Amino acid sequence: MEKKENGLDGKQSGRVINGPTNPMVTPLLNDLYQFTMAYAYWKAGKQSERSVFDLYFRKNPFGGEYTIFAGLEECIKFLANFNLTDEEIDFVRDSLPGCEEAFCDYLRGLDCSDIEVYAISEGSVVFPKVPLLRIEGPVAVVQLLETPFLNLINYASLVATNAARHRFVAGKSKLLLEFGARRAQGPDGAISASKYCYLGGFDATSNVAAGKLFGIPLRGTHSHAFVSSFMSLDEIVDKVLRSSDGKSTCKDFICLVQTCLTKIQNSSSLQGIFSETNQSELAAFISYALAFPNSFLALVDTYDVMKSGIPNFCAVALALNELGYKAVGIRLDSGDLAYLSTEVRKFFCAIERDLKVPDFGKMIVTASNDLNEETVDALNKQGHEVDAFGIGTNLVTCYAQAALGCVFKLVEINNQPRIKLSEDVTKVSIPCKKRTYRLFGKEGYPLVDIMTGENEPPPKVGERLLCRHPFNESKRAYVVPQRVEELLKCYWRGNADEAREELEPLKELRNRCIKQLENMRPDHMRRLNPTPYKVSVSAKLYDFIHFLWLNEAPVGELH
């Protein structure tokens, strides 16, 4: 396959597609056996045979019954810029002792101008066995896409699903912040996690690089180190703060804060809760407020939450309020989050009531500290006053499940359907080039995803259709769809001038994810014993699967 202009420079129908986010995503991001197979195909004269591969997964992650599809954009960027440099070809030559120079010339001419990719829209809710991507093209080239595609989709879909599950358990009203950069598996793990957690429903990230690359909102304040770095109020040299409207100036903000702290101590509702607060902590809070008067949010558990952190924060927040600013809130990073958040809210509300400060009780309470799906669920059951959750380690590392397990299987070559058999029926592939549809019921929920042969007529609204389990003959049902949606759309058509789907902004992918999850039937979404979503094949495809299965399986002989 010769290099075409649109494959070489990432153009398709006049559009230029940038390369992958990570520059390490090159054709060498591959398993060696992809190159050994390419050489063997080439030696056998099979390298240009037209093949069809499906990329799919076999089981939903985290014990759930749904998955979020992510990573498609990076795959298309990889395709659009696919080519091997001379240096890379030299390395392949050295890695394949005895390979002919003509094979290196063949590699030098490769691009993806003869590849077609059909995919489900990124950000969609997807299910096992259904192809996420269908890749068509010369078999040797398609095999060189297998490892990069799996690498780009497996983690992206896994962490997006993890984020979606955290969003589901937290609820729509809570702010979810991804704090995982320091615990992620390397730089790319951190960047990818930030991107796909946002897609999966998180609101913001602490990762500045991800904010720059993808336009994700950034959130962050300070650490315990900032608080403990201060020793006394004497360290604050510049005590001046102009009012928010710029009309007046407070020449001694420290004095104003101390006055506010005394007011809190004398408040009828709060007497006896605290006495002397930690003055070095107060110095840290004042210093931070002077730097960020419009967005003051403090970490309050460095010393003691209720006896020091909260009174000190409230004193600074009241002082800011007198100058026309509104503090944002606090963060809790340790302790009993349900109890502490409730007590903090009571403290805020007492000040609002006693000192007549409007909306003081509505300030944000953020919780962090090794949170995960289970702990957020437990907090909900206990009752809490947390408005925002900062989640890191368990989210970005996908601690509950290490991998999604997407696979890349040949389903057709030279127009001949192929099947992969196994003693484990879950690993038997579904052969031939297929079309996939989502059928919706009367209540608007999706009922079933059905795969059909490429040339079968599509399901029609209002017409009764038999849906069969691919491998279990007793599992079957008639469906009368009220709406039919074809899932696989063309995202890459090589050197053809025909239309294809555009790559969408990350925010639109996020919106799709949120909307589709809202439209799922509740029993598919619940954490405990969710109902499996039905994935079926047409009656005609079912018959063909089992015909091919019997045809390819060797017949045993008993003696």
Curated annotation (Swiss-Prot):
Entry coiled-coil feature ranges: none
GO BP term (any one): NAD biosynthetic process
Cofactors: Mg(2+); Mn(2+)
Positions bound to nicotinate: 33, 221, 331
Catalytic reaction annotation: nicotinate + 5-phospho-alpha-D-ribose 1-diphosphate + ATP + H2O = nicotinate beta-D-ribonucleotide + ADP + phosphate + diphosphate
Known pathway: Cofactor biosynthesis; NAD(+) biosynthesis; nicotinate D-ribonucleotide from nicotinate: step 1/1
Keywords associated with the record: Glycosyltransferase, Ligase, Magnesium, Manganese, Metal-binding, Phosphoprotein, Pyridine nucleotide biosynthesis, Transferase
Similarity remark: Belongs to the NAPRTase family.
Described function: Catalyzes the first step in the biosynthesis of NAD from nicotinic acid, the ATP-dependent synthesis of beta-nicotinate D-ribonucleotide from nicotinate and 5-phospho-D-ribose 1-phosphate. Helps prevent cellular oxidative stress via its role in NAD biosynthesis.
Protein name per the record: Nicotinate phosphoribosyltransferase 1
Name of the encoding gene: NAPRT1
